[in-house]
Amino acid sequence: MTDQPADDAVASARLLVAYVSEDEELDHVRDAATEIGRRSGAKVILYDRDSASAFSDPMPNQWASQAEGAQFGDPLSDQELVKLGREPFAAKVAAAREAGVDAWGWLASDHGTDAVVAYARDHGADLILLPADLEEPGLAERLKGETVDNAVEEAEASATGLVVVLVASDGATELAAGRL
C-alpha cells in the first residue's frame, strides 16, 4: 500500500484492482483500469464480482481432483480463466492485455465489496477502482444503504491506505476523499 498523495499514487501505481462484472454492466470500471494501467505501467487485476456463488466455489477446492487447484495461480491469466470455464471474463482480461496492459483476473468467492477490498489489501495493491454508483451494504462495514462515495468519505482520512478511484458510468474518474 502507499503513503503518497492520492494523485501521485494513481500516476505511480504498481498494482491496481478493479471491481468488474462478466457482463457489460461494469465495463466502464474495466476501461478506466485499463487506461490507468496503460499510462502507469501498473499490473491490473480485474476482480470478477459475478463469480461469487452461495452454492459453489469458482476455484477448485480440496474436493477437486488431485492437484487440480495447484494448476492455477493468483491472479489468473486469461488462459487459466478459460480452463475454469470463464470465457467471457477471460476475453476481458485478454482485451486488456492486447491493449498493452499487464492484466490478470480473479474470481470472487464471496459477495460484496468487502471481499474485493480484502483481496486488494492482501495483494499489496496501490489502488482500487469501484463503480461510483454502486449501492451495496458492506464496504469495509461502512455502507448501510449508502453509496460507495459516501462510505469512502466516512473512511479514515489518512495519508496511508488503499487509494480509491470511483468510476462514473460515463467513465469519468474521481479520487475518493478517504482511503481504505
What are the roles of these predicted feature ranges?
Residues L127-A157, T173-A176:
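Glycine-rich, Arg-bearing micro-motifs that act as flexible, cationic patches
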